[in-house]
UniProtKB/Swiss-Prot annotation:
This is Probable dual specificity protein phosphatase H1 homolog. Its EC number is 3.1.3.-, 3.1.3.48. Keywords: Host cytoplasm, Host-virus interaction, Hydrolase, Inhibition of host innate immune response by virus, Inhibition of host interferon signaling pathway by virus, Inhibition of host STAT1 by virus, Interferon antiviral system evasion, Late protein, Protein phosphatase, Viral immunoevasion, Virion. It comes from the Viruses. Serine/Tyrosine phosphatase which down-regulates cellular antiviral response by dephosphorylating activated STAT1 and blocking interferon (IFN)-stimulated innate immune responses. Homodimer. The lineage of its organism: Viruses, Varidnaviria, Bamfordvirae, Nucleocytoviricota, Pokkesviricetes.
Length: 166
């Protein structure tokens, strides 16, 4: 077993945990990047600080309000879809928003698989390279799973992220 296979095995075994509850609230990921679900978008108050919403669900919608721009990256939640190009595109947007200090909310329908995978990809991309990948990955995964109750339950998405960044 080589190092990459060993890391993948450790991460796969360490992330095989049960869902404790489904996420309801928006979670602050960084100073300007947030993770949520479709319901969070529908229930946004009239005064919100989000300037961009990244929608990675299949549902295309327009907000009645004009103070928020919705960017749609349609992504199915199944075991056969490739998420790599979506991670790259969403990471580009999130890096740009972060650098310009523009608040952005990333969501899918439930805020569990698609949007969580995009967030994990973003965090892997911007991580401190002095911290070993496997340690950082497990830290982020378990922290967000603890906060949100469910986080990247689609094992195909999880494996694709591992393969992309190991």
């Amino acid at each position: 077993m080589d190092e990459k296979q060993l890391y993948k095995h450790i991460i796969t075994k360490s992330t095989n945990t049960c869902v404790k509850f489904t996420p309801r609230d928006i979670t602050k990921i960084t100073d300007y990047v947030y993770l949520g679900n479709y319901r969070n978008v529908i229930e946004l108050p009239n005064k919100t600080f989000f300037k961009y919403i990244v929608n990675v669900s299949m549902l295309k919608y327009k907000l009645k309000r004009t103070d928020i721009t919705v960017l749609h990256f349609p992504l199915e939640d199944n075991d056969t879809v490739s998420i790599s190009k979506h991670i790259d595109a969403v990471t580009y947007v999130l890096k740009k928003c972060e650098s310009l200090k523009i608040p952005v909310l990333v969501h899918c329908m439930a805020g569990i698989n698609r949007s969580s995978a995009m967030i994990m990809g973003y965090l892997m991309e911007i991580r401190d390279k002095n911290i070993p990948f496997v340690i950082y990955f497990l830290y982020i995964y378990h922290e967000l799973k603890y906060i949100r109750g469910a986080f990247i339950e689609n094992k195909s998405f999880l494996n694709q992220i591992i393969d992309k960044y190991i």
